[in-house]
Curated annotation (Swiss-Prot):
It comes from Human herpesvirus 6B (strain Z29) (HHV-6 variant B). Forms a portal in the viral capsid through which viral DNA is translocated during DNA packaging. Assembles as a dodecamer at a single fivefold axe of the T=16 icosahedric capsid. Binds to the molecular motor that translocates the viral DNA, termed terminase. This is Portal protein. Disulfide bonds: none annotated. The gene is U76. Keywords: Host nucleus, Viral genome packaging, Viral release from host cell, Virion.
Length: 662
C-alpha cells in the first residue's frame, strides 16, 4: 500500500502562506485578499488530487497489452459461485464454511485479551484487594477458621475478576463484523489478494468500556493496559473488507506491481498468495485455482448427465428407416398409373424389367416383340406376322427382312440408352450445382441461428440453468439442440441407440472431486479432521497451523493488532466461559493468592498466638488444598484430554513486520 508523502502540496502551500503573513508588512485588507487567494489555490490543488485519485483508471492504457487483469474474471466468478452453492453442491463448500467460521477469530481475541489482562495483575493489587476486604469484614477467629475466611474471599474475587473480564470481552466482540472475516477467507481462497479500506479511526470511548467493570482491580488493569484494548477497538472499527462488487485488481506487466481499485479509487490490499506469470499467462496460486481443471471436468460430466436425463425423458424413442420391399410389379403399376402413353424411356425401362422377369426363350421373345410394337410398330415385318401373305416369297427375302428388324431394334435401343444417359448426366450436373448452392445457404442460416435466433441454446449459463429450471421449460430448451439424421445402408445395422433411458453415472466423479477438494483445503490450511472411534468424521476445525496461517495475518496485517498471544488449538473446543476459567487457573493470580494466604496466616498466628493446628478439631490451619485442584479445575483436565486425544502440536508464531506491506 502506498503511503502519502509528508511533503504534500498542502503542507508546502500552507508553510509559504504562514511565512508571507509573518514577514510581510501589508495592510489587513490586502493580507485578507492574499489569504483568500491562497485558500482558493489550496482548494484547487486538493480538488486536482482528489480527481486524480478517483479517475486513476482513466490513465491506464486503453488496451490490455500492458496489464494483466486479475479480478474480475470469468474463472474467479465461477469460483465464487461454486463456493456458495449457486449452481451445484460440493463437499468442499462445507469445508470452506468451516474455514470461514468467525467464532475462531472471536475466541482468539477473547483468549488474547483475557491472557493479557489476567497476567497483568500484580501482587500489590491482590494485596490491596485483600486489605480492602479485611477492613470491611475483619477476621475475629470465632468458630471460623482462617482457611474458610480466606477461601470465601478468594472465590469471590475470582468470580468478580472473571465476570468483569467477560463483560469487557463481550463489549469488544460486539464490534466484530462477521462478514469481514468471511470475505477475507473468500478472497484468499479465490484470488489470493485481499482488498481492504481504512476509515478514519476514532478514539475508542473507554468510558463505555469501563462501565462494564464493577471492581476497582479490573478498572485499574484496563487503564494500565490501554495498549492492549485500544488497538483492538481501533482495528475492528477502522478496517472494511469489501465484497466482490466494483473491485478491480490488475498487475502491471512492466513494473510487475499489483494495484487494487474500488469504484475507480485506489485502495489498500494484502497479498496472501502472489500470482505467477507463466508463458505470458497469469496463473493464480489459490486452492480454487489448483482445483480448477478438475472442477471443469466434473461440471462437464454433470451437464452431460443432466442433458441426457432431459433428452431421454420421453417414454419411447424410435429410429425409422425405409424398408426395401418394392417389387418390379409395383414399379410397373406405378408407371402405368402415372401415364398411360409411355414415352421411349419408360418403354425401355418396362422392357428391361420384363426381360429380368422372363425365365424362358418364349418370355424373352414376347418381351422383345412387345417393346418393338410399342415404340415403333412400323418396323415389324408384317410378312412374318401374317404368314398367309408371305408364304410364297423367297427365303432370302425373309432373311433380309429379319436382319433389317434386328438392325432397327438395335439402333432404337442404343438411341434410347444414349438419350437416357445424356439426360441423366445433365440432371446430375444440375443437381450438383444446386446442391452446392443450398449447402452454402444452409451454412449461412446455421450461422445466423447460432448468433441471433437461438440465444438460449448458446447461452454459456444454459448448462447450469438446466439444474434449476422446471422440467417442462428445461425440456423445451433441450429440444432445440440439433440432431443429425443418418441414413443406413442395406448392408449395415444399428449397433447402439437410445431405445431405453441412458444417464451417465457421476457417483465416482462426485466422490473423487470431494476427495480432491478436501485434500486441497486440509493440506493448504492445515485443517484438522476430527473423527470418532469408528473413524467417522465429526467435524473439521482449525489447527495451530491454521491459526498462524489465517488468524494471525488477519490481526497483524489488516487490523494492526500485534500484542495478542495465539490461542492454543485445544482451547478452540471450549466455550468462552471455559476459556476464561482455564486462563485464570493457569495464571499467576493463583500464586499471588497463595502467597497472600501464607503471609496473612503467619501474621494472624502471631496476633492470636495460634499454633499450626485448629484449636477445636486439631486440623492444620494451613491447608494447601485451598489451591490444589478442585472441581473447577476439571477444565484443565479437559484441556489435557483434548490435547492427548487430538495429538496437538504447538509451534512458534512467526514475527510479521509492523505496518502495512502489500
Amino acid at each position: 500500500m502506498h503511503r502519502a508523502s509528508a511533503n504534500s502540496p498542502l503542507n508546502s502551500v500552507s508553510g509559504s502562506m504562514m511565512w508571507r503573513n509573518q514577514s510581510s508588512g501589508r495592510r489587513p485588507s490586502k493580507r485578507l485578499s492574499d489569504n483568500e487567494a491562497t485558500l482558493s489555490t489550496i482548494n484547487s490543488i486538493l480538488g486536482a488530487e482528489d480527481m486524480l485519485s478517483k479517475n486513476l483508471l482513466s490513465y491506464l492504457p486503453p488496451n490490455n497489452e500492458e496489464i494483466d487483469m486479475i479480478y474480475p474474471s470469468e474463472q474467479i466468478m465461477t469460483f465464487i459461485e461454486m463456493l456458495h452453492g449457486h449452481k451445484n453442491f460440493f463437499k468442499g463448500q462445507t469445508i470452506h464454511n468451516a474455514l470461514r467460521d468467525s467464532a475462531v477469530l472471536k475466541k482468539q481475541i477473547a483468549y488474547g485479551v483475557a491472557q493479557a489482562l489476567l497476567n497483568s495483575v500484580s501482587i500489590q493489587q491482590i494485596h490491596d484487594e485483600w486489605k480492602r476486604h479485611v477492613r470491611s469484614f475483619p477476621f475475629h477467629n470465632k468458630k471460623l477458621s482462617f482457611q474458610d475466611y480466606f477461601s470465601v474471599w478468594a472465590h469471590a474475587i475470582k468470580q468478580v475478576i472473571l465476570g468483569d473480564i467477560s463483560n469487557i470481552i463481550n463489549f469488544i466482540l460486539q464490534s466484530i463484523d462477521n462478514s469481514h472475516y468471511n470475505r477475507y477467507v473468500d478472497w484468499i481462497c479465490t484470488v489470493g489478494i485481499v482488498p481492504f479500506m481504512r476509515t478514519t479511526p476514532t478514539a475508542p470511548n473507554l468510558y463505555n468500556l469501563l462501565q462494564q467493570v464493577s471492581s476497582k482491580l479490573i478498572h485499574d488493569i484496563v487503564r494500565h493496559k490501554q495498549n492492549i484494548v485500544t488497538p483492538i477497538l481501533l482495528g475492528l472499527s477502522s478496517v472494511i473488507i469489501p465484497d466482490f462488487h466494483n473491485i478491480k485488481i490488475f498487475r502491471d506487466r512492466n513494473s510487475e506491481q499489483i494495484s487494487c481499485f474500488k469504484n475507480k479509487k485506489a485502495i489498500a490490499f494484502f497479498t496472501y498468495s502472489t500470482p505467477y506469470v507463466i508463458r505470458n499467462r497469469l496463473m493464480l496460486t489459490t486452492p480454487l485455482a489448483h482445483l480448477s481443471p478438475e472442477l471443469k471436468k466434473h461440471n462437464s460430466l454433470r451437464r452431460h448427465q443432466k442433458m441426457c436425463q432431459l433428452l431421454n425423458t420421453f417414454p419411447i424413442k424410435v429410429l425409422t428407416a425405409a424398408k426395401t420391399d418394392v417389387t418390379n410389379k409395383k414399379i410397373m403399376d406405378m408407371i402405368e398409373k402415372e401415364e398411360k402413353n409411355s414415352d421411349a424411356k419408360k418403354s425401355l425401362i418396362k422392357f428391361l424389367l420384363n426381360l429380368s422377369d422372363s425365365k424362358s426363350k418364349i418370355g424373352i421373345r414376347d418381351s422383345v416383340e412387345g417393346f418393338i410394337q410399342e415404340i415403333t410398330p412400323s418396323i415389324i415385318d408384317q410378312n412374318k406376322l401374317m404368314l398367309n401373305r408371305g408364304q410364297f416369297r423367297k427365303r432370302s427375302a425373309i432373311d433380309t427382312g429379319e436382319r433389317d428388324v434386328r438392325d432397327l431394334f438395335k439402333k432404337q435401343i442404343i438411341k434410347c440408352m444414349e438419350e437416357q444417359i445424356q439426360t441423366q448426366m445433365d440432371e446430375i450436373e444440375t443437381l450438383k450445382t444446386t446442391n452446392q448452392m443450398f449447402e452454402r445457404k444452409i451454412k449461412d442460416l446455421h450461422s445466423l441461428l447460432e448468433t441471433n435466433n437461438d440465444c438460449d441454446r448458446y447461452n454459456p449459463d444454459l448448462d447450469h440453468d438446466l439444474e434449476n429450471l422446471s422440467l417442462s421449460r428445461a425440456l423445451n430448451i433441450v429440444q432445440r439442440l440439433p440432431f443429425t439424421s443418418v441414413s443406413i445402408d442395406d448392408t449395415r445395422s444399428v449397433a447402439n441407440s437410445f431405445f431405453s433411458q441412458y444417464i451417465p453415472d457421476t457417483q465416482y466423479a462426485d466422490k473423487r472431486i470431494d476427495q480432491l477438494w478436501e485434500m486441497e483445503y486440509m493440506r493448504t490450511f492445515r485443517l484438522r479432521k476430527n473423527v470418532n472411534n469408528q473413524g467417522q468424521e465429526e467435524s473439521i476445525t482449525y489447527s495451530n497451523y491454521s491459526i498462524e496461517l489465517l488468524i494471525v495475518p488477519f490481526l497483524r496485517r489488516l487490523l494492526n493488532i500485534y500484542n495478542l498471544e495465539s490461542i492454543p488449538e485445544e482451547f478452540l473446543f471450549l466455550s468462552l466461559g471455559e476459556i476464561l476459567l482455564a486462563i485464570y487457573e493457569s495464571s499467576k493470580i493463583k500464586h499471588y493468592l497463595r502467597l497472600v494466604y501464607v503471609r496473612e496466616l503467619n501474621q494472624i498466628s502471631e496476633v492470636y498466638n495460634l499454633t499450626q493446628t485448629h484449636p477445636e478439631n486439631n486440623e492444620p490451619i494451613f491447608d494447601s488444598n485451598i489451591f490444589s485442584p478442585n472441581p473447577e479445575n476439571e477444565i484443565l483436565e479437559k484441556i489435557k484430554r483434548i490435547r492427548n486425544l487430538r495429538r496437538i502440536q504447538h509451534l512458534t508464531r512467526p514475527n510479521y513486520p509492523k505496518g502495512d506491506q502489500d
